[in-house]
Amino acid sequence: MRHQLRIPLLSKPADQRKALLRGLTTQLIREGRVTTTKARAKALRNEAERMISLAKEGSLASRRRAIGYIYDKKLVHSLFEKAKERYGDRNGGYTRIVRTVSRKGDNAQMAIIELV
């Protein structure tokens, strides 16, 4: 049964879903914005905000957790350097989801997720 399922399944097995979200999180932190489907953007928001919260905390343990999740090690170090000054006064809500036009091929709802 599907009662109280906290994460969206995204029609993928667990390993593929985790790899997809890791890749999207890495790309979002690198580029600042990602265009994807609305369901993926909503799932990505949780992971990206978790990584930014770890970066704001700044401890060695949180840095190691972020290195274990984000694919690019240099990107993690730059995130930890910039997160406190960029998001220091903000308690969550580090991302914004903006809906865009539907995808032409399958009419999927698309969205742009960007860092605030």
Swiss-Prot record:
Q: Name one GO molecular function term.
A: structural constituent of ribosome
Q: Which UniProt keywords apply?
A: Ribonucleoprotein, Ribosomal protein
Superkingdom classification of source: Bacteria
InterPro entries referenced in this protein's UniProt entry, alphabetically? Ribosomal_bL17 (IPR000456), Ribosomal_bL17_sf (IPR036373)
**Residue ranges of the TM segments:** none
Q: List, in alphabetical order, the GO biological process terms annotated in this UniProt record.
A: translation
Under the heading Pfam families, the entry gives:
Ribosomal_L17
- GO CC annotation: cytosolic large ribosomal subunit
Note the NCBIfam families from the entry. Answer: L17
Family assignment? Belongs to the bacterial ribosomal protein bL17 family.
Name this protein carries in UniProt: Large ribosomal subunit protein bL17
Q: Which species? A: Prochlorococcus marinus (strain MIT 9301)
Gene name, please? rplQ
